[in-house]
Design a protein with these regions (language model features):
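Concave beta-strand-loop units of leucine-rich repeat
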Residues: 5-20, 24, 30-42, 46, ...
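Low-complexity, Pro/Ser/Thr-rich intrinsically disordered segments
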Residues: 315-321
Length: 321
C-alpha cells in the first residue's frame, strides 16, 4: 500500500510474496528494472505503460496474456517462463490462500514480442508455444530459452546469428538447418526432439556445451570440427561410429549411454585429451569391458554398465542411468 507514490523508483524487486494485484505499479513509470517472479499474478496490464523498463522478470506466475508487453521497446532482458509441475504442487501444498484454479504455463501467443528488438535475453520456456515466428526480427538476442514448449518449426531463428546460448529441448523439432549460420554459439541444448541430421552444427566452432540426447541421430561426423567442445551428451540415439570424436581433445564430460549398438570406442581411446578427472558414460552400450578398463586406467570417471550378455562388466553393478 502506498507504493504507487514512489514514482522516482528505478529498481523494484518483489518476488515470492503471493502478490496477485500489481495495479499500483502503473504509476512507477521511471522503473528500469522490475522483478516480480514467483508470485500469483495473472493480469500484467498495469505494466503496459512502464516504457522505460530494460529488465523485466515475471516468471513463475499464472500469466497467459502478454499483450501488455508489446510497447516495452527498451527491454533488453525478459523472463516470462512457466513452472515445473513439481514447483506448482509445492506452492499449492502451502495452503496459504492461493487460488488453486489459476493456469500456469499458458502462454501460446508471443506476437507481442515481435517489436522488442533490443532484447538480448529471452526466457519463454515451460509454456505452450508452437509458433515462434514473432522472434524472427529479434536479431540482437544472445540468450534464448524456449525449451518444453510445442515448437516444430525453428525457421524464424535463421537470422539470430548473435545467439551464444539456445536451449530448445523438449519440443518437436526435426529440421535444425536454420541454425547453420550461428557460428558464435557456445551452448546448445536440443535434447528430446526428433532430430536425425545434425549437419547444421558443423560450423559452430565456438561451441563448448552441446546436448543432443533422446533424438534419432546416427551420423555425428559434423561434430569433428567442434574442437572447443567440453561437454557433449549424446545418450539414447542410434550412434555406432564415434570416430568424429577422436580429435576433440577438450572433452571433459561425454555421455554415449543407451546407444545400444555402440561397440567400437577405439577412436575415444585415441583421443589423448580424455584422461584423469574426465567423465565418460557408456552405460547400456555394447562396449567391451576391456575398453572400459582402458579408460579406467587413465583415471577417467566411468559410469560403466554395458549390455554385453545382458549384464555389466565383472565386478560392476547393473544400474539405470
Amino acid at each position: 500500500d502506498g507504493i504507487q507514490n514512489l514514482t522516482g523508483l528505478t529498481v523494484l524487486t518483489m518476488f515470492d510474496r503471493l502478490i496477485t494485484d500489481i495495479s499500483p505499479l502503473r504509476h512507477l513509470t521511471n522503473l528500469t528494472d522490475l522483478v516480480l517472479h514467483t508470485n500469483w499474478i495473472s493480469d500484467i496490464e498495469p505494466l503496459s505503460g512502464l516504457v522505460n523498463l530494460e529488465r523485466l522478470i515475471i516468471s513463475e506466475n499464472p500469466i497467459s496474456d502478454i499483450r501488455p508487453l508489446a510497447g516495452l521497446t527498451k527491454l533488453r532482458q525478459l523472463h516470462v517462463h512457466g513452472l515445473y509441475p513439481n514447483q506448482l504442487q509445492y506452492w499449492l501444498d502451502m495452503d496459504d490462500g492461493r487460488d488453486p484454479d489459476v493456469v500456469f504455463n499458458g502462454i501460446t501467443d508471443i506476437s507481442p514480442l515481435a517489436g522488442l528488438t533490443e532484447l538480448r535475453l529471452l526466457r519463454i520456456h515451460l509454456n505452450a508455444i508452437s509458433d515462434i515466428s514473432p522472434l524472427a526480427n529479434l536479431t540482437n538476442l544472445i540468450h534464448l530459452r524456449l525449451y518444453d514448449n510445442q515448437v516444430e518449426d525453428i525457421s524464424a531463428l535463421a537470422d539470430l546469428n548473435k545467439l551464444v546460448l539456445l536451449w530448445a529441448h523438449g519440443n518437436q523439432i526435426e529440421d535444425i538447418s536454420p541454425l547453420s549460420g550461428m557460428s558464435e554459439m557456445q551452448q546448445l541444448s536440443l535434447n528430446d526432439n526428433g532430430i536425425s541430421d545434425i549437419g547444421a552444427l558443423g560450423n559452430m566452432t565456438e561451441m563448448d556445451h552441446l546436448f543432443l540426447s533422446d533424438n534419432t541421430i546416427e551420423d555425428i561426423a559434423p561434430l569433428q570440427r567442434l574442437q572447443a567442445l567440453e561437454v557433449l551428451r549424446l545418450e539414447n540415439n542410434d550412434i555406432t561410429d564415434v570416430s568424429a570424436l577422436a580429435g576433440l581433445n577438450q572433452l571433459r564430460e561425454l555421455s554415449l549411454a543407451r546407444n545400444w549398438s555402440l561397440y567400437d570406442v577405439q577412436p575415444l581411446l585415441r583421443n589423448a585429451g580424455i584422461g584423469a578427472g574426465d567423465e565418460l558414460d557408456l552405460r547400456f552400450t555394447a562396449v567391451r569391458c576391456s575398453d572400459i578398463d582402458a579408460f579406467a586406467n587413465r583415471g577417467v570417471t566411468l559410469l560403466r554398465v554395458t549390455t554385453v550378455n545382458g549384464s555389466g562388466c565383472p565386478g560392476r553393478r547393473l544400474e539405470d542411468p
